């Protein structure tokens, strides 16, 4: 019976061989991408694809557990939830910060990661699509696709097209509904939240950038705080990665503020007023609005979440650990953090993730902080029961309170880093290597350009509708971009042999918003990472040119769902190969946002290039063969032995030491924005 079921499941969708096969099951990537595209197309409606609909009707999850490593434990648990009707209802909201809803999502993640072949994986994905809350399902499916070896070449469609309500103003959604009602295609311009009367409106282009929000949720999908080894492998240096991604967001936000003549972020204080309010102007798919928050509110206890004093207690315990140089684990042992690995432990504690050595004692400062601030508009749930934008990774970056919270957390990390011994000259030297010259080829200039994305998934359609019949309804929003440029670095290798080098490029605002030059030790903490890559240096002079588009810090825009569909169907039809590998990793920043906006007068930045020993830096020899030295790592493995931000991550008591290191170089550059806007009509 089991064999017959497997054959039936496999026969329910066509098999196309010959191109871009995945390991270990040999099913073409094009087939997998096709299936995922249709699972997410019209997410809130029944499946529209005939083969998947047939599979939905015939697949029995309990009949396909023989090859699962856990013997079907995860499937049985999820099926029991289905049978007892304990799953979250459809058309309801979902937040990963809600423990009950999160556990439900993890049941599906476990089921999908237990699948050892594509027929079983897609069968389960199809079956549970109709059983689960739509947003829970998307979170679980995206996470499983990111971590399963079966889907290593599958591209996750952009979430702003899968769940447009999270990224699109209610006003535009209403315009789209009206266009759909009268069956007239439409393209609708969307404005950023707030008005000119709100100073924060000047930088809404950054926090509300849909690509930046996609980066943020993709990072959290790649490095979920709930992850442990039972899901397949351990994620290395997860806590340090958590520190770095948020440190960079804060630093980039600060650089954008300087570009717009705004004062620096004031960090959060639990016992002071929260000055910045926020009205997101967005609604859930079921019509419930995202809660708003007034200006100048006193931070209150939040019912069923936490009290303000709880947050202060957590903070003080973390401060004590930093001051003493150790944390306490569950057995009462002292775990030293005054070393290069301490940042990893501290990050695990602050978030807090499963690797937290003593969660019951240190609590969850970050996650609880998001929930506390998110409920300040209605702390006693008198008017809302829906989560705020701060309780969704897709929307959190839009709220100014996000940056106040993370400035406050970043200050804790800095206190820890400042406790560490500064780097010595020996720590920093790359013997025989010197940076002679740093230059920029091309303009450091930014501009805004209109971007269009589909609202198709926000609209309801008839069940018999086919993809090609979908009406073109879309939103248009301006996005920051920069003109192409290249870094040019002249490096002298005075050794008699080739040397593998790691080239690390950073920049920080040369002056604060008041025009005062930042001291070196202050500037280096505000540095934004622009690139990190490896290069073989021949003996003698080496002139290295690195295009801005090649930066390992950034990734290109993922193709639209329509484009993914068209490319996939063309590959299946045999007219072209499906080659989407450049879009598989979506954890980097959008390549449009590599440099800050700047302004018409030009914003000065100190550009620092550090050339370090590539052999000593690399985790293994395989990295030497890669062209993408990605700083977030891959599949739980971080590829660089050095700490994030090295060599700028530790305090510099005397900047003269830094200037005397021959393998480091620096210069001053200016970034311009001349109010250029490229419109698409």
Swiss-Prot record:
Carbohydrate-modified residues? 98, 191, 228, 624
TM ranges are: none
- List the signal peptide residues: 1-21
Q: Any keyword Lyase?
A: no
Keyword annotations from UniProtKB, A to Z: Glycoprotein, Signal
Tell me which tissues or organs this protein is expressed in. Answer: Strongly expressed in ovaries. Also expressed in heart. Not detected in hepatopancreas, gills, connective tissue or muscle.
Q: Report the GO molecular function annotations.
A: oxidoreductase activity
Q: Which InterPro entries match?
A: Di-copper_centre_dom_sf (IPR008922), Hemocyanin/hexamerin (IPR013788), Hemocyanin/hexamerin_mid_dom (IPR000896), Hemocyanin_C (IPR005203), Hemocyanin_C_sf (IPR037020), Hemocyanin_N (IPR005204), Hemocyanin_N_sf (IPR036697), Ig_E-set (IPR014756)
- State any further remark: Does not bind copper.
- Report the sequence similarity comment from the record: Belongs to the tyrosinase family. Hemocyanin subfamily.
Task: State the protein's purpose.
Answer: Does not function as a hemocyanin.
Q: PANTHER family recorded for this chain?
A: FAT-BODY PROTEIN 1-RELATED, LARVAL STORAGE PROTEIN/PHENOLOXIDASE
Quaternary assembly: Hexamer.
Return the protein name: Pseudohemocyanin-2
């Amino acid at each position: 019976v089991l064999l017959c079921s497997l054959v039936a499941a496999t026969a329910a969708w066509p098999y196309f061989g010959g191109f871009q096969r995945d390991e270990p099951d040999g099913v073409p990537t094009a087939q997998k991408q096709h299936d995922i595209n249709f699972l997410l197309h019209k997410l809130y409606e029944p499946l529209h694809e005939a083969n998947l609909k047939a599979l939905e009707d015939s697949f029995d999850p309990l009949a396909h557990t023989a090859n699962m490593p856990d013997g079907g434990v995860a499937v049985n648990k999820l099926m029991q939830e289905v049978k007892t009707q304990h799953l979250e209802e459809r058309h309801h909201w979902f937040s990963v910060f809600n423990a009950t809803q999160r556990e439900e999502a993890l049941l599906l993640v476990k089921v999908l990661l237990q699948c050892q072949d594509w027929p079983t994986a897609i069968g389960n994905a199809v079956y549970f699509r109709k059983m689960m809350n739509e947003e829970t399902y998307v979170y679980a499916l995206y996470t499983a696709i990111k971590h399963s070896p079966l889907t290593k070449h599958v591209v996750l469609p952009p979430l702003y097209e899968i769940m447009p309500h999270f990224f699109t103003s209610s006003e535009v959604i209403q315009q789209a509904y009206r266009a759909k009602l009268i069956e007239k295609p439409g393209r609708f311009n969307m404005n950023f939240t707030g008005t000119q009367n709100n100073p924060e409106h000047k930088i809404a282009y950054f926090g509300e950038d849909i690509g930046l929000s996609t980066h943020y949720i993709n990072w959290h999908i790649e490095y979920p705080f709930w992850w442990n080894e039972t899901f397949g492998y351990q994620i290395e240096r997860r806590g340090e990665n958590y520190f770095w991604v948020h440190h960079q967001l804060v630093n980039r936000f600060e650089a954008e503020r300087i570009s717009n003549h705004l004062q620096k972020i004031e960090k959060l204080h639990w016992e002071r007023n929260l000055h910045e309010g926020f009205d997101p102007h967005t609604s859930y798919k079921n019509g419930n609005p995202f809660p708003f928050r007034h200006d100048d509110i006193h931070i209150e206890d939040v019912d069923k979440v936490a009290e303000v004093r709880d947050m202060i207690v957590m903070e003080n315990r973390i401060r004590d650990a930093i001051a003493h140089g150790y944390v306490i684990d569950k057995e009462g042992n002292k775990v030293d953090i005054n070393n290069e690995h301490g940042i990893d432990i501290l990050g695990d504690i602050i978030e807090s993730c499963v690797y937290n050595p003593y969660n019951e004692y240190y609590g969850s400062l970050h996650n609880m902080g998001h929930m506390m601030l998110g409920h300040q508009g209605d702390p006693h749930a008198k008017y809302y029961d829906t989560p705020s934008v701060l309780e969704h990774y897709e929307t959190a970056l839009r709220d100014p309170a996000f940056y106040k919270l993370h400035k406050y957390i970043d200050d804790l990390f800095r206190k820890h880093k400042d406790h560490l011994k500064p780097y010595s000259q020996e720590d920093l030297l790359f013997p025989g290597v010197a940076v002679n010259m740093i230059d920029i080829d091309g303009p450091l200039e930014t501009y805004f350009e209109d971007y269009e994305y589909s609202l198709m998934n926000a609209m309801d359609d008839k069940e018999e509708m086919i993809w090609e019949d979908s009406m073109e309804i879309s939103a248009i929003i301006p996005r920051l971009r920069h003109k192409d440029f290249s870094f040019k670095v002249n490096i002298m290798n005075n050794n008699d042999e080739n040397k593998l080098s790691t080239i690390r490029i950073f920049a920080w605002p040369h002056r604060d918003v008041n025009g005062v030059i930042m001291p070196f030790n202050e500037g280096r903490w505000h540095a934004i990472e622009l690139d990190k890559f490896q290069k073989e240096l021949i003996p003698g002079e080496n002139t290295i040119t690195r295009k801005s588009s090649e930066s390992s810090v950034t990734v290109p825009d993922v193709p639209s769902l329509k484009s993914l569909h068209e490319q996939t169907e063309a590959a299946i039809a045999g007219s072209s190969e499906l080659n989407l590998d450049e879009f598989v990793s979506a954890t980097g920043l959008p390549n449009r946002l590599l440099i800050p906006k700047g302004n018409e007068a030009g914003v000065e930045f100190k550009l620092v290039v550090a050339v370090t020993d590539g052999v000593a830096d690399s985790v293994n020899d395989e990295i030497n063969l890669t062209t993408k030295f990605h700083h977030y790592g891959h599949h739980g493995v971080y590829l660089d032995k050095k700490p994030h931000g090295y060599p700028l991550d530790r305090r510099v008591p005397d900047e003269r030491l830094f200037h005397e290191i021959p393998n480091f170089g620096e210069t001053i550059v200016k970034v311009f924005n001349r109010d250029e806007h490229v419109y698409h009509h």
